[in-house]
Design a protein with these regions (language model features):
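Nucleotide-sugar-dependent
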Residues: 285, 347-356, 361-383, 391-400
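N-terminal subdomain of nucleotide-sugar transferases
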Residues: 2-99
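A charged, aromatic-enriched C-terminal amphipathic alpha-helix characteristic of glycosyltransferases
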Residues: 412-416, 426-461
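Nucleotide-activated donor-binding/catalytic signature segment of Leloir-type glycosyltransferases, i.e.
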Residues: 305-308, 315-317, 322-355
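Membrane-proximal helix-turn-helix segments that form the acceptor-binding/catalytic region
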Residues: 66, 153, 160-164, 171, ...
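Helix-loop-beta element that forms the nucleotide-linked donor phosphate-binding surface
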Residues: 204-205, 210-211, 216-253
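Conserved donor-binding/catalytic core segment of Leloir-type glycosyltransferases
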Residues: 258-285, 291-295, 314
């Protein structure tokens, strides 16, 4: 009997010891306060920023990192390191990148039957990588700033890691994960309902919340019932998005792009208009709207409105539906339905993308907003470069970003988009009016928005 009790005690003590040994180290504010006395080496705060996605394609989270570092904080940026990050990120000694391991290639499949098998394995792999990064690969931090969506499994893992490491959790709401899932499955699907419950449950563990619109803040307060501070933090362009006022500089840059080679003569003659659209090639951006409008524009330019200028549409971005649309565009070109329009896709460096926006005639946003209360960052960047915008406007938060007829115009169909293109390209004075409004909007900058809201919360302003 005694030997049995001793054995049980041994196993229990071993299990407890192992558990304590495996617990992640905790943030100690007293130790941090002692370090802060030596201002020459100690940061004002320490922050982990988590992006369950490609860091290079998450501009807002990169801007958070740069602002924290500018204020004297230390940042550990956690996410997939697939695309080129902002050059100031990689050169800043106060910012380090902890790259998440990509999914093993054998788990990546388009086969629906294999997806049912590999799907749970991919989620399990993701959970392990997230937990390992948040709990063991990084030092404990005062704050953990998490991008949402994606919410699964991010919010649960982040909540647990924050609790165990004595870290304050902040959720930066870009949209709602369950509304994006509903685009594919429908509002009543069990997975959508579970996703909504999950999101509403785990977000309650956050110390504070940032969100991209006032409308989103209202939903978080009134429908999610959150009592922690909810701070609307509107997107604003980073400093490298600036207008180019010299037309010869604009023209010179456009001529340097490989994408303009087929229409260089038209560009030099001034009979070409360049439009730019940045898309994620996903279900919440109906690219067929733009294709249809451009086909109809080409037809008008060939028939009843021969004075319309030719158009070069430069499309940037990566995503799952890209190849599908490229095949569709190729067929339309072969059929002669885009004779007055040239469509080119590209992926540019951060600086070249900013210069492209500053040199183009119009920006196009196809973002339809699954929730109705998020806003497209791409429009913010366009305004930063002084580029007027035509965008899908059938959602609640659109007026928080675009002032109709002042810095851009909204549309709700390909026909309305076509009407705007024809009107603006037939009447240069109207285009110049909204360009002036966009350049005025470019004066509103990220740091001006960030400092009194996020900077104040983090103790950096």
């Amino acid at each position: 009997m005694i030997e049995s009790l001793i054995s049980v005690a041994f196993y229990i003590s071993t299990a407890v010891t192992l558990l304590l040994f495996l617990l992640p180290s905790r943030y100690d504010p007293r130790r941090f306060d002692r370090l802060k006395k030596d201002a020459s080496i100690a940061p004002k705060t320490t922050t982990q920023i988590l992006v369950l996605g490609d860091i290079g394609r998450s501009p807002r989270m990169q801007y958070h990192a740069l602002s924290i570092a500018r204020g004297g904080g230390q940042v550990d940026l956690i996410g997939y390191n697939e695309s080129e990050v902002h050059p100031d990120i990689s050169s800043n000694p106060r910012i380090s990148i902890t790259a998440l391991a990509p999914h093993p290639t054998f788990l990546q499949t388009s086969n629906k039957l294999l997806f049912l098998l590999f799907g749970p394995l991919k989620v399990a792999f993701q959970i392990v990588c997230l937990w390992w990064a948040l709990a063991y690969r990084t030092e404990p931090a005062q704050w953990l700033l998490v991008q949402n969506p994606p919410s699964i499994p991010t919010l649960a893992i982040a909540s647990m890691a924050s609790f165990l490491r004595h870290t304050k959790l902040i959720i930066d709401w870009h949209n709602f994960g369950y509304t994006i899932l509903a685009l594919k499955l429908g509002d009543r699907h069990p997975l959508v309902r579970f996703s909504k419950w999950y999101e509403k449950s785990f977000c309650r563990y956050a110390t504070a919340h940032f969100c991209v619109t006032e409308a989103m803040a209202s939903i978080l307060k009134n429908h999610f019932g959150l009592t922690a501070p909810i701070l609307p933090l509107h997107d604003r362009p980073a400093s490298h998005f600036q207008p180019i006022f010299d037309q010869s500089e604009q023209k010179s840059f456009l001529e340097s792009l490989p994408e303009t080679a087929p229409v260089k003569d038209l560009l030099q003659a001034g009979s070409l208009r360049v439009i730019v659209s940045s898309t994620s090639w996903t279900a919440d951006e109906d690219f067929s709207l733009l294709i249809d409008a451009l086909c109809r524009y080409s037809n008008l330019a060939n028939t009843s409105k021969p004075a319309l200028p030719a158009v070069l549409a430069i499309i940037t971005g990566k995503g799952p539906q890209k190849e599908m649309y490229l095949k569709q565009i190729s067929k339309l070109q072969e059929a002669g339905k885009l004779s007055k329009v040239t469509i080119r896709t590209t992926w540019l460096t951060t600086d070249d993308y900013a210069r492209l926006l500053a040199s183009a005639s119009l920006g196009i946003s196809l973002h339809t907003s699954s929730s109705g209360v998020d806003l497209p960052m791409k429009v913010v960047d366009m305004f930063g470069a002084g580029l007027p915008v035509l965008g899908w406007d059938r959602f609640q938060a659109w007026p928080e970003l675009v002032t109709e007829g002042v810095n851009g115009m909204g549309f709700g169909s390909s026909g309305e988009l076509l009407d705007h293109l024809v009107d603006l390209f037939e009447n240069p004075s109207k285009l110049e009016k909204i360009r002036t409004g966009a350049r005025k909007e470019s004066n509103r900058r990220w740091n001006d928005e960030w400092d009194p809201i996020a900077g104040k919360l983090l103790g950096l302003a």
